[in-house]
Each structure stands twice: as C-alpha cells, then as structure tokens.
Amino acid sequence: MLTENYNKQAIAQAFGRAAGCYDRFAELQRTSGERLLALMPAHSGLQVLDAGCGTGHFSRYWRQAGRNVTALDLSAEMLAYAREQHAADRYLEGDIENLPLADSCVDICYSNLAVQWCDSLPRALGELYRITRPGGVIAFATLADGSLSELSQAWQRLDGTQRTNRFLPHSVIDAACQPYRHHLLQEREVCLFPDVLALMKSLKGIGATWLHEGRTPGLLSRARLAALSACYPQEQGGYPLSYQLVYGVIYRD
C-alpha cells in the first residue's frame, strides 16, 4: 500500500505536468466552478481562499470582484502558472487536509473540483471550516460515484480492469457535511468527444489520470486505443463521458 505522502506527491506531479495546458482542456472545471458561484449565497467578506486553485481561473474571478484572494494548491507548477497570470494576492503551496493557515482567517472558502483528491473528505471540510470566520461560507464542488462510468465500462469490456478513479457515493459526501449547517445538490454533466483519443487527452490535460490505488493508466498503443474505442458506448455520434457533480455550501456558525 502506498503512503499518503507518496499519493499526494504523485497527484501534485500529475497536475503539475498539466499546468501549461490545463485551461485548454478545463471545460468541466469552468462549468462546475460557475455553477458553484451561482449556488453560493451573496457574501460581502473580503478574504477569500481558493482551495485547490489550479491555474487560478476562479482566483482571478474573485480578485476582479474586489476580494483579497489566497490561492492554494498542492502543485507548485500550478501555483507558478497562477502567479504568472496575476490571479491572486497571495500564493500558498499546501494540502487542503492540513491547511497552513490560522483559525478564522478567511470569510469565504471556495473549492472547485479539488476535494475529491483528498484522502479524507471529513478532514478536508473540517480544515476549511476551521479557517473560516463565523458568519462565513464554504462552497465546494466535487465528483461523486458514477463519474467516468462510460470509460470504466469500456475498460471492463476490454480487459476486465478498473482503470478509472472511484469517487465517493453521495451518501458519504452528505455524511461528511452532517456536522455543519449545509445544503447539497447533485447534477450530471456529460461531455461529448469526437473520438476516444480526444476523450483521454481531456483527462490527461486536466491532470486527472492519477488513480487513487497508485496505478497510472499508462500509454495506449494505437491498437489498444482502437480496441478501447470498439468497446466504448457511443451517443449522438460521439463518445460521452459523464460526471456526477456534487455542490456543497456550508455555513460557518
């Protein structure tokens, strides 16, 4: 079994390799991030933490809205890219499950598609709650069980292997939120690709080819890709990849 530190290092490296091309492939991240913003209650607080900021796309949104933004990410390469874009006011390399921040130091915690990579969702939410001031708000978007189901089915048909990440069921995400006043919403988002190669590139382009079990999918030969394509379900003339998105808003009492 791989250690937690090794897992976190591998995840950071996977996203670090994607830093330069992340925004070109990050349609899902933008869609979920904008939806999360729409679900958040209005809040006048000035201090914002973008937890798992990636390239800083939404850090920039908050900064342009007049907030003082701390961009935090596990990947030094992602942070460097965000810094180049002048996305935030402050940049922190760190782990959501062990935030290098004082208690009650921000008004808003915003985390778009990051906590699914954490080892313990309750610990991650507890840390975000800890650093948020009373009266503040924590908003997160994450992936739930059933995400990448078409790709998972294709691999199962091809060779019987599990080559996609497993995500938490909605019930487990809900249980992690129970200590707090909160509300959750689950929605399905489907991305359609012209071929399986483009689909796989989209995952690699956003750094999401890391597997929780410590395995990596490896390179696909042309023959292997053709075989996977033959096993992949088609829809509307394309290759679908669905995501089960869970949006959560927690109120800091």
Curated annotation (Swiss-Prot):
Belongs to the methyltransferase superfamily. One of its GO terms (molecular function) is malonyl-CoA methyltransferase activity. This is Malonyl-[acyl-carrier protein] O-methyltransferase. Keywords: Biotin biosynthesis, Methyltransferase, S-adenosyl-L-methionine, Transferase. The gene is bioC. Its EC number is 2.1.1.197. The keyword ATP-binding does not apply. Converts the free carboxyl group of a malonyl-thioester to its methyl ester by transfer of a methyl group from S-adenosyl-L-methionine (SAM). It allows to synthesize pimeloyl-ACP via the fatty acid synthetic pathway. Pfam families: Methyltransf_11. It catalyses: malonyl-[ACP] + S-adenosyl-L-methionine = malonyl-[ACP] methyl ester + S-adenosyl-L-homocysteine. GO terms for biological process: biotin biosynthetic process; methylation. It is an enzyme of class 2 (transferase).
